[in-house]
Amino acid sequence: MAKKVTGYLKLQVPAGAANPSPPIGPALGQRGLNIMEFCKAFNAQTQKEEKNTPIPVVITIYADRSFTFEMKTPPMSFFLKQAAKIQSGSKAPGRDKAGKVTKAQVREIAEKKMKDLNCDSIESAMKMVEGSARSMGLEVAG
């Protein structure tokens, strides 16, 4: 028989940097989960990732206080900031441009994010990436 799911917990944790300090410790602790077990398992699975890459993780919590977790791809804004070589997006996205990304970079980001996006073609994924880029104040060039 399958275990009874009592809840889900969504966190964004830097790759290889999960530790019991806030926000991870309190979030897991108040649900009665083993914090160190999660930290060790997460850090082991994110060894290949670049250090401090934000990794969204969905933790499934079961009635017997056990858990499983699923890692997603880093946020689109992270990839866009890397591609445009900027620290943050524009403060006024409609007026000020923070940087530029090319169509080739947009396609590359769309291919990386494809499994987490709610679309079935690379073209629709590219439109999502372009929309995110525009909302960050990035110009999508040729």
Swiss-Prot record:
CDD domains: Ribosomal_L11
Keywords annotated in UniProt: Methylation, Ribonucleoprotein, Ribosomal protein, RNA-binding, rRNA-binding
GO terms under biological process: translation
Keyword Endoplasmic reticulum: no
Post-translational modification: One or more lysine residues are methylated.
SUPFAM superfamilies (UniProt xref): Ribosomal L11/L12e N-terminal domain (SSF54747), Ribosomal protein L11, C-terminal domain (SSF46906)
A single GO cellular-component term on record: cytosolic large ribosomal subunit
Pfam families for the chain: Ribosomal_L11, Ribosomal_L11_N
GO molecular function, one term: structural constituent of ribosome
Signal sequence range: none
Gene3D superfamilies assigned to the protein according to its UniProt record, in alphabetical order: Ribosomal protein L11, C-terminal domain, Ribosomal protein L11/L12, N-terminal domain
Family affiliation: Belongs to the universal ribosomal protein uL11 family.
HAMAP family: Ribosomal_uL11 (MF_00736)
Function: Forms part of the ribosomal stalk which helps the ribosome interact with GTP-bound translation factors.
NCBIfam families: L11_bact
Assembly information from the UniProt record: Part of the ribosomal stalk of the 50S ribosomal subunit. Interacts with L10 and the large rRNA to form the base of the stalk. L10 forms an elongated spine to which L12 dimers bind in a sequential fashion forming a multimeric L10(L12)X complex.
Name of the protein this chain belongs to: Large ribosomal subunit protein uL11
